[in-house]
Regions:
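N-terminal helicase ATP-binding lobe
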Residues: 1-189
Length: 189
């Protein structure tokens, strides 16, 4: 059974949520979480409900939403503009095709930054982006957040810079061994 969710930062179309999605959201809003759901079971609505709530709860902070590929990033950007009730200009999508100085300027007024992990990593290392004022970082396809992958590096940078921020890793495939799953959970925080 699903219910329509009403929130000031969700569009009038509202998102339908099932009980398991609301239970997951409750956990996400209180502690860093690895969300594992099969494809098609509604990870994106959970992510967007978390974005809506964190922007509402901490309007002076940002949310960063990472995706490993530009096509996936574009889909999340489209979904965010459709389902979030925040000024459209405060939702930005940045990738390596945009000059870092322009990205820096765009990020200053953004509430939601959708980006590839390489861009965030490079901008943080360069000093053109700070993660201190980020209340939530979402790592979509979180199974990539291992080893020296840019997703893992950004997660580490975020956990080192953010005092009270939350990390949400979402994936349908956390790993094939207990060790890889435990490593991913430890990496997410």
């Amino acid at each position: 059974m699903s219910a329509r969710i009403s929130h000031p930062n969700l569009s009038s179309e509202n998102i339908e949520a099932r009980a398991y999605q609301l239970k997951a959201l409750k956990n996400i809003l209180h502690s860093s979480t690895l969300l594992v759901l099969p494809t098609g079971m509604g990870k994106t609505p959970i992510e967007l409900m978390a974005v809506a709530d964190k922007i509402y709860e901490s309007p002076h902070k940002k949310v960063i939403f990472l995706a490993p590929t530009n096509p996936l990033l574009a889909q999340h950007y489209k979904d965010a503009k459709k389902f979030l009730n925040i000024p459209e200009e405060s939702i930005i999508m940045i990738n390596g095709g945009i000059n870092w100085e322009k990205r820096q300027k765009m990020a200053q007024s953004a509430k939601l930054i959708l980006a590839t992990p390489q861009v965030i990593r490079n901008d943080v290392i360069r000093g053109s982006l700070s993660l201190v004022d980020c209340s939530l970082m979402i790592i979509d396809e979180a199974h990539h957040a291992s080893g020296k992958h840019a997703m893992a590096q950004v997660a580490d940078l975020y956990l080192n810079q953010s005092n009270d921020g939350l990390l949400l890793g979402a994936t349908a495939s956390p790993g094939s061994t207990d060790k890889s799953i435990i490593n991913l959970i430890n990496r997410i925080g």
